[in-house]
């Protein structure tokens, strides 16, 4: 049996980017949770070689699922239920929509010769979690607390992760007062991993060919159906959270996405970091409870961010659809 220290170490190996207990599950963890609850997890390919399918990873998933339930179910303070689902506003598009396949193919041609020339084992991104503080009178104060994550790793699977709090803001978008309990710039996690300890999913270097990229995402990214855009985006999100792709690799990634059906334009949007982009929604044919939003740079077509939106159908959730349940914006 594991003692507490060994159990914690194994959970970190399974999910090295896990943030403190009030953080939401990652895009990857949400995908795994949905596959387990819908029964899709049983459809395993015998050729897969995923580190994250090991028993410690399942334990980490169950822990993350517990924290998800803690965040979305009502809290009981003084006998009065208080919803704590303060989330960012849903992205809305404007202007003339662009056809997804046409736009990404045009962007792929532009990106192929762009820097960097070689991939970098590093990723920097902003994600978010919900915080709720309980006052002495039983009232609550909910706010969105972004986190800035930097992951650096090496071929021997050693590396570092640093998590810094961003500027907290209220659900309607205004900045919280200076008295907000989570100040911007505070380091909430700083950890180093020795060789072999970092649980990187896409350890192999990404390919520069579109067909090879599709196979790469399917093999390492846990994709059950390559024609399910939501599943594909979950794998893409994991990849971009581990690598800074070369221009040729990013081009191949976009070309591979052009072959995936189900993307619909929502028009011009501004992502969570204030960047101009084009938004495309993707609905899984097997899970109508959520849809994904992919934001591409309006000029270059580079992938800027992704969001997950709850559409309804989960009675236990305490918030009304549509509600953003997670976002990640790469820098």
Residue ranges: model-predicted function:
Residues 1-92:
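N-terminal export/targeting signals for secretion/compartment entry
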Residues 54, 63-331:
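Intrinsically disordered, low-complexity prosegments and terminal tails associated
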């Amino acid at each position: 049996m594991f003692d507490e220290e060994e159990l914690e170490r194994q959970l970190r190996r399974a999910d090295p980017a896990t943030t403190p207990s009030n953080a939401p599950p990652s895009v990857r963890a949400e995908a795994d949770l949905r596959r387990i609850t819908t029964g899709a997890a049983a459809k395993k390919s015998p050729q897969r070689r995923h580190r994250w399918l090991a028993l410690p990873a399942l334990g980490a998933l169950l822990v993350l699922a517990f924290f998800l339930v803690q965040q979305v179910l009502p809290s009981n303070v003084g006998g009065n239920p208080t919803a704590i689902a303060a989330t960012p506003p849903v992205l809305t598009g404007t202007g003339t929509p662009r056809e997804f396949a046409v736009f990404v193919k045009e962007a792929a041609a532009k990106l192929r010769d762009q820097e960097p020339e070689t991939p970098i084992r590093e990723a920097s991104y902003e994600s978010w979690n919900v915080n709720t503080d309980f006052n002495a009178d039983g009232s609550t104060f909910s706010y969105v607390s972004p986190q800035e994550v930097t992951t650096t790793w090496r071929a021997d699977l050693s590396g570092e992760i640093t998590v810094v709090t961003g500027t907290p803001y209220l659900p309607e978008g205004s900045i919280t007062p200076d008295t907000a309990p989570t100040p911007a710039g505070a380091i909430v996690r700083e950890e180093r991993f020795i060789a072999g300890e970092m649980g990187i999913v896409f350890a192999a270097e990404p390919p520069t060919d579109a067909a090879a990229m599709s196979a790469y995402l399917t093999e390492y990214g846990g994709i059950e159906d390559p024609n399910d855009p939501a599943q594909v985006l979950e794998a893409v999100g994991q990849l971009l959270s581990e690598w800074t792709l070369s221009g040729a690799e990013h081009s191949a990634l976009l070309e591979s996405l052009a072959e995936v059906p189900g993307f619909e334009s929502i028009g011009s949007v501004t992502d969570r970091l204030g960047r101009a982009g084009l938004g495309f929604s993707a609905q899984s044919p097997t899970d109508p409870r959520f849809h994904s939003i992919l934001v591409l740079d309006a000029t270059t077509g580079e992938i800027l961010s992704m969001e997950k939106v709850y559409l309804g159908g989960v009675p236990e959730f305490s918030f009304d659809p549509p509600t953003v349940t997670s976002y990640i914006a790469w820098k």
